[in-house]
From Swiss-Prot:
Entry keyword set: ATP-binding, Cell membrane, Membrane, Nucleotide-binding, Sugar transport, Translocase, Transport
Purpose: Part of the ABC transporter complex XylFGH involved in the uptake of xylose and arabinose. Responsible for energy coupling to the transport system.
Protein name listed in UniProt: Xylose/arabinose import ATP-binding protein XylG
Ranges for domain ABC transporter: 5-241
Coarse class of the protein's main subcellular location: membrane
Disruption phenotype: Deletion of the gene results in a growth defect on D-xylose and L-arabinose.
Alphabetical list of CDD domains matching this protein: ABC_Carb_Monos_I (cd03216)
SMART domains reported in the protein's UniProt record: AAA
Similarity comment: family membership: Belongs to the ABC transporter superfamily.
């Protein structure tokens, strides 16, 4: 595996509040990385820096070996970084194929090429092993897991190299959550880098190749999956939450 994104000593404050305090981590091509942390850990701020909504006060982002500065989400997207937020940014009363091509519709000179969009959507969903019976279905009729899948498919079609998934299993049933985690594995097989941001330790451990834990703006834990287990990660997160561990004892 080779480095896709490297985050080097990133700091970010909002007034007197230090959201990120020297965060360093990396995401490689063809791997799933889980970033775990409770509310207020700094996960959302880090996502917004990677996706171009915020600039770091200090530190660097290195994408495919080159330092990058994002002035907007479009800058991140142009390099192949796609972010899938909890709201998914889908239009409920439009069909699946239209949502996949939303704002980037295929046209035939003047008119929309519905046939082409439908064919490409079906081919894409099949390639990602996403099983939806009819691409003409409106998004409002899909389950939560299927909606996640449509949002991911849209990102992949437009040449994503890295997918950020923000709490992708929140409010999903156990069965639907497993389907979303399997989708992340399929993205890994296609050579993409996947960063899953979650507070669910079990799901994060299950799907990830490597696990980071963020607490009050600092990375307090980083190990490969085979080097740790759910119990250790839970102990670390609980100990820091209760103030039983000094930051100098980072694992």
């Amino acid at each position: 595996m080779s480095d896709l994104l490297e985050i080097r000593d990133v700091h970010k404050s909002f007034g007197a509040v230090k959201a990120l305090d020297g965060v360093s981590m990396e995401i490689n091509k063809g791997e799933v990385v889980a970033l775990l942390g409770d509310n207020g850990a700094g996960k959302s701020t880090l996502i917004k820096i990677i996706s171009g909504y915020h600039k770091p006060d200090r530190g660097d982002l290195v994408f495919e070996g080159k330092k990058v500065i994002f002035n907007s989400p479009n800058d991140a997207r142009s390099l192949g970084i796609e972010t899938i937020y909890q709201d998914l940014a889908l239009i409920p009363d439009l069909p699946i194929y239209y949502n996949i091509f939303l704002a980037r519709e295929v046209t035939n000179k003047i008119f929309l090429n519905k046939k082409k969009m439908m064919e490409e959507s079906k081919k894409l969903l099949d390639s990602l092993q996403i099983r939806i019976p009819d691409i003409n279905m409106k998004v409002e009729n899909l389950s939560g897991g299927q909606r996640q899948a449509v949002a991911v498919a849209r990102a992949v079609y437009f040449s994503a190299k890295m997918i950020l998934m923000d709490e992708p299993t929140a409010a999903l049933s156990v069965v639907e959550a497993r389907k979303v985690l399997e989708l992340a594995r399929n993205l890994k097989k296609k050579g993409l880098g996947v960063l899953i941001i979650t507070h669910n330790i079990i799901q994060g451990y299950e799907v990830a190749d490597r696990i980071y834990v963020l607490d009050r703006g600092k990375i307090i834990f980083h190990k490969k999956k085979e080097e740790t287990n759910v119990e250790e990660i839970t102990e670390v997160m609980t100990s820091f939450a209760l103030g039983k561990v000094n930051l100098g004892e980072k694992r």
